[in-house]
Amino acid sequence: MIMKEFICGIDEAGRGPLAGPVTAAAVILPEDFEIELLNDSKKLSEKKRLVLEELIKQKSIAWSVVHIPHNIIDEINILNASLLAMKNAFENLATPSGEFYKGEVSKIIVDGIYFPDLKVSDGVECITKVKADATEPSVMAASILAKTARDKLMVEFSKLYPEYQYEKHKGYPTKLHKEICKKIGPSPIQRRTFKI
């Protein structure tokens, strides 16, 4: 008998911006998911990411997205905030219908070199992998959910703070964003520990 593998992919978006949250997602895909549709979220157009976001949410076995806000990033640093977001995303996995995921996980793959402090059952393989967001389907899916969720939140912040034009740069350290900050000062969602 062939055992099914339940692989949970975890990735984050938003480690480098000067403003806004760091966002992590965790995803468990079914074995029949059309993986050829996936790619590293950074290589996909925004339109394609949004289409895939809905598909992943509908077809996944379980998924979760978590934001850690700028003030917590300043308090515990970006690495610890990223790991906390990943931990919380894993611990809050839910089915597409919104029920808490109580099923099994046979392997957890985290993009990068640091593994969050997760409470997992014995026998669960836990690995980190650099560039997993370009090679591992469940991590690719997590990358897409994290990026789309964070981008949508930054667009909402642009409505609260239109002068910062977050809808254009999503808080990343672009020339435009740096010029705005130098001209009018930091926004209420600025990461104070990041240099402009």
Protein language model features and the residues they cover:
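RNase H-like, Mg2+-dependent phosphodiesterase core
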Residues: M1-I196
